[in-house]
């Protein structure tokens, strides 16, 4: 997919589906070919050669997100064995900065899509709810690179954060009331007022976020 094909129907369709310009699609295609070894699809093992991911404590969750059928809009659960370039673009579109030409409704929709992507990273069993155990796993992985924080401390941090989430989402709970986990609606409440744009970037693919701006 070179410059000669930049105006092709295929590229125009991808522009419409992902919001990327033809130049951005060409740039992402070059990165896709690097990752895939010039093959038509990418498998999980292709991400083993990404230096910026090697030391990332949630590397496995980031890679898994690329193959999650929910993120690929191919179903409510399950993982794909491999992804093609259009799938790759679909995932990368979650990281695309909000366009300044968007109206308020479009901005809110884009923000919700980004948060849904993050929610799926936590909700590993695809049941639509982030349980305490799932939350603990993420926190423990995030803190695993810190030699000063033991596993029990990480669990305590996760437990405290989950209690705070319950407070935000349910208000004052009865002593015998059990908080079963964070739904996506709860997740939206927790992230209300937080700048999601600064939390999602693509540096692990050796591509600066600004390169994906219009």
From Swiss-Prot:
Q: Which keywords does UniProt give here?
A: Calcium, Cell membrane, Cell projection, Cytoplasm, Differentiation, Disulfide bond, Lipoprotein, Membrane, Metal-binding, Myristate, Nucleus, Protein kinase inhibitor, Protein transport, Transport
Instruction: Enumerate the SMART domains for this protein.
Output: EFh
Concerning what turns on (or off) its expression, the entry says: Up-regulated during granulocytic differentiation in a ERK-dependent manner (is mediated by activation of ERK) (at protein level). Up-regulated during the differentiation and maturation of primary megakaryocytes. Down-regulated during monocytic-macrophage differentiation in a ERK-dependent manner.
* GO cellular component terms listed in the entry, alphabetical order: cytoplasm; cytosol; lamellipodium; nucleoplasm; nucleus; plasma membrane; ruffle; ruffle membrane
Q: What is its main location?
A: nucleus
- Where, if anywhere, are coiled coils annotated? none
Q: What does this protein do?
A: Functions as an integral cofactor in cell pH regulation by controlling plasma membrane-type Na(+)/H(+) exchange activity. Promotes the maturation, transport, cell surface stability and exchange activity of SLC9A1/NHE1 at the plasma membrane. Promotes the induction of hematopoietic stem cell differentiation toward megakaryocytic lineage. Essential for the coupling of ERK cascade activation with the expression of ETS family genes in megakaryocytic differentiation. Also involved in granulocytic differentiation in a ERK-dependent manner. Inhibits the phosphatase activity of calcineurin.
Task: Describe the family membership recorded for this protein in Swiss-Prot or TrEMBL.
Answer: Belongs to the calcineurin regulatory subunit family. CHP subfamily.
Q: What is this protein called?
A: Calcineurin B homologous protein 3
Q: Which organism is it from?
A: Homo sapiens
**Gene name as annotated:** TESC
